[in-house]
Design a protein with these regions (language model features):
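Non-catalytic C-terminal accessory region of glycerolipid acyltransferases
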Residues: 2-46, 60, 112, 116, ...
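A short, well-structured juxtamembrane/interface segment
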Residues: 43-67, 78-80, 85
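A broad, low-specificity signal marking well-ordered, structured residues that form hydrophobic/aromatic
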Residues: 49, 68, 93, 143, ...
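Hydrophobic alpha-helical segments
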Residues: 54, 85-88, 108, 162, ...
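Conserved beta-strand termini and adjacent loop/short-helix elements that scaffold enzyme active sites
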Residues: 54-56, 98, 120-123, 205-207
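Catalytic core of membrane glycerolipid acyltransferases/transacylases, capturing the structured
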Residues: 66-123, 184
Length: 235
């Protein structure tokens, strides 16, 4: 991956100069224990799923020891921790979580599932979150991103993931998930909840760094990535 100093790189300088001491809400450890039964229940639920990944996808997920930027649509995020546990257990994964009070509970829940949390959003502490994500990738850790989260609209691709791919030279892994038996919520994204013991088919698409990305605006590159993932998505 590319070695970049976020303090001096023009694309990150504005983020670095942001007042990054903005308050990040946290909850005491003893309060987070309230979430433990739910975390155990969800882990057991996810363990029953029959996740079928294409043979090439399995090989690349296991073989690639470099940090990856893993892309899910927001409505398919429920299986992200289980997918990583099964196929990239040796690598730590981190997710982007809001710095708000609600985000504090989600970050605590993520930790119980073995997922690290980078606190930030497009509206609050976004610049500092970009820097922290870069540090995680530099340390060899994966990053999982829902480019249309947390508020949508559904299937929108935020330029942030494209900017990270441009500046870190990390491989993007797009995860299109086909659910054979799932409940779909009436939420803004139509969130999927796969039923226990149901089958999920995944054929990951790996997009390696291309030097041409440096000459494409992040928004244009994000739209290109969006079209790629949409073409793989089955609703």
């Amino acid at each position: 991956m590319s070695e970049i100093d976020p303090q001096n790189d023009p694309s990150f300088r504005g983020a670095y100069n942001e007042a990054y001491q903005r308050r990040v809400r946290e909850i005491p450890f003893w309060k987070s224990l309230i979430l433990l039964p739910l975390a155990i229940f969800l882990r057991l639920w996810l363990m029953t799923l029959r996740i079928h990944v294409s043979s090439e996808g399995v090989q690349r997920l296991f073989r690639d020891k470099n940090p990856l930027i893993i892309i899910f649509w927001h409505n398919r995020l429920l299986i992200s921790s289980e997918l990583h546990r099964r196929f990239r257990r040796w690598s730590k994964v981190n997710g982007l979580v809001s710095p708000s009070s609600d985000g504090a509970w989600l970050a605590a829940f993520f930790r119980m599932l073995g997922i690290g949390a980078v606190r930030g959003s497009s509206g609050r502490r976004g610049g500092q979150a970009m820097i922290e994500i870069h540090k995680k990738l530099s340390a060899g850790e994966d990053i999982a991103i829902a480019p249309d989260g947390p508020r949508g609209p559904a299937y929108r691709f935020s330029p942030g993931a494209a900017l990270l791919a441009q500046k870190t030279h990390c491989t993007l892994v797009m995860i299109p998930s086909k659910f054979h038996c799932a409940i779909r919520l009436r939420s803004w994204d139509g969130f999927y909840i796969p039923l226990p013991f149901s089958r999920i088919d995944i054929d990951p698409k790996f997009i390696t760094y291309d030097k041409m990305w440096e000459h494409i605006p992040a928004k244009s590159l994000a739209e290109e990535f969006r079209q790629t993932l949409l073409a793989l998505t089955e609703d």
